[in-house]
């Protein structure tokens, strides 16, 4: 899948789950299951419930995503 095919949306972390998984509520009200991208994991950026994040979604599976940025 090319990088151009992703859908980027903003959301808020609602819940944390085991294995660095998070439930994120998007701006349109949908909830997705998201993991942390490699660069966030490598730089030890902490993500807590209530944080505003940017999520990449694949057009093939809109229920799972990847957290690519945590807003300050």
Swiss-Prot record:
Principal subcellular localization: cytoplasm
Keywords (A to Z) from UniProt: Cytoplasm, Initiation factor, Protein biosynthesis, RNA-binding, rRNA-binding
Subcellular location per the Swiss-Prot or TrEMBL entry: Cytoplasm
Superkingdom of origin organism: Bacteria
SUPFAM superfamilies xref list: Nucleic acid-binding proteins
Domain S1-like: 2-72
UniProt GO cellular component terms: cell surface; cytosol
Membrane-spanning ranges: none
Annotated GO MF terms: mannan binding; ribosome binding; rRNA binding; translation initiation factor activity
Annotated S-S bridges: none
PROSITE patterns per record: S1_IF1_TYPE (PS50832)
Subunit-structure text: Component of the 30S ribosomal translation pre-initiation complex which assembles on the 30S ribosome in the order IF-2 and IF-3, IF-1 and N-formylmethionyl-tRNA(fMet); mRNA recruitment can occur at any time during PIC assembly.
NCBIfam families: infA (TIGR00008)
PANTHER family in the record: TRANSLATION INITIATION FACTOR IF-1, CHLOROPLASTIC
Family statement drawn from the similarity comment of this UniProt entry: Belongs to the IF-1 family.
Primary role: One of the essential components for the initiation of protein synthesis. Stabilizes the binding of IF-2 and IF-3 on the 30S subunit to which N-formylmethionyl-tRNA(fMet) subsequently binds. Helps modulate mRNA selection, yielding the 30S pre-initiation complex (PIC). Upon addition of the 50S ribosomal subunit IF-1, IF-2 and IF-3 are released leaving the mature 70S translation initiation complex.
Protein name, per record: Translation initiation factor IF-1
Taxonomic classification: Bacteria, Bacillati, Bacillota, Bacilli, Lactobacillales
């Amino acid at each position: 899948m090319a990088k151009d095919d992703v859908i980027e949306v903003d959301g808020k972390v609602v819940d944390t789950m085991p294995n660095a998984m998070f439930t994120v509520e998007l701006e349109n009200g949908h909830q997705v299951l998201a993991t942390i991208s490699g660069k966030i994991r490598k730089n030890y950026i902490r993500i807590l419930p209530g944080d505003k994040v940017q999520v990449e979604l694949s057009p093939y599976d809109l229920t799972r995503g990847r957290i690519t940025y945590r807003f300050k």
